[in-house]
Amino acid sequence: MRKSYRVKTERDFQKVFKEGQSMANRGFVVYTLPKENQKHFRVGISVGKKVGHTAVARNRLKRFIRATLTELKPEIRPDLDFLVIARPYARDFDMGRTKKNLIHVLRLAKVLSSEETEIEEK
């Protein structure tokens, strides 16, 4: 995912935290903030040290989240900034469980424009 699709600055992160709405499941919390006049969505990903004690574990989960979001890119509403925060429960997720849980919470948060997202089991 290109840099233009990322929430980068601390100021932008804090704005989404403070002014946005949150939705959660056991694995992830998603904060959303509608933004008008935006060409495409922007996403921030946070995986704290409580989730994985090593950088390898945290980066692996971030890769899974980014891969899922890249796959869902056509279905994500373009008028949003949103943050995906991993919870400690997501520590041992493989790609399939990450995708399933992330799609679930994105549906709850109304980030996906269509309700008919297919979950492919591999």
Curated annotation (Swiss-Prot):
Q: Which SUPFAM superfamilies match?
A: Ribosomal protein S5 domain 2-like
EC category name: hydrolase
Q: Name the family the entry cites.
A: Belongs to the RnpA family.
Q: How does it assemble?
A: Consists of a catalytic RNA component (M1 or rnpB) and a protein subunit.
Q: Does the keyword Hydrolase apply?
A: yes
Source organism of this protein record: Lactobacillus johnsonii (strain CNCM I-12250 / La1 / NCC 533)
Tell me, what is one Gene Ontology molecular-function annotation carried by this entry? Answer: ribonuclease P activity
Q: What is its EC number?
A: 3.1.26.5
Pfam families, per database record:
Ribonuclease_P (PF00825)
Write down the NCBIfam families for this protein, in alphabetical order. Answer: rnpA
What name does UniProt use for this protein? Ribonuclease P protein component
Protein's job: RNaseP catalyzes the removal of the 5'-leader sequence from pre-tRNA to produce the mature 5'-terminus. It can also cleave other RNA substrates such as 4.5S RNA. The protein component plays an auxiliary but essential role in vivo by binding to the 5'-leader sequence and broadening the substrate specificity of the ribozyme.
Q: Name one GO cellular component term.
A: ribonuclease P complex
Residues forming coiled coils: none
Tell me the keywords, alphabetical order. Endonuclease, Hydrolase, Nuclease, RNA-binding, tRNA processing
Question: What residue intervals traverse the membrane?
Answer: none
Q: Which gene encodes it?
A: rnpA
GO annotations under biological process? tRNA 5'-leader removal
- Catalysed conversion reaction: Endonucleolytic cleavage of RNA, removing 5'-extranucleotides from tRNA precursor
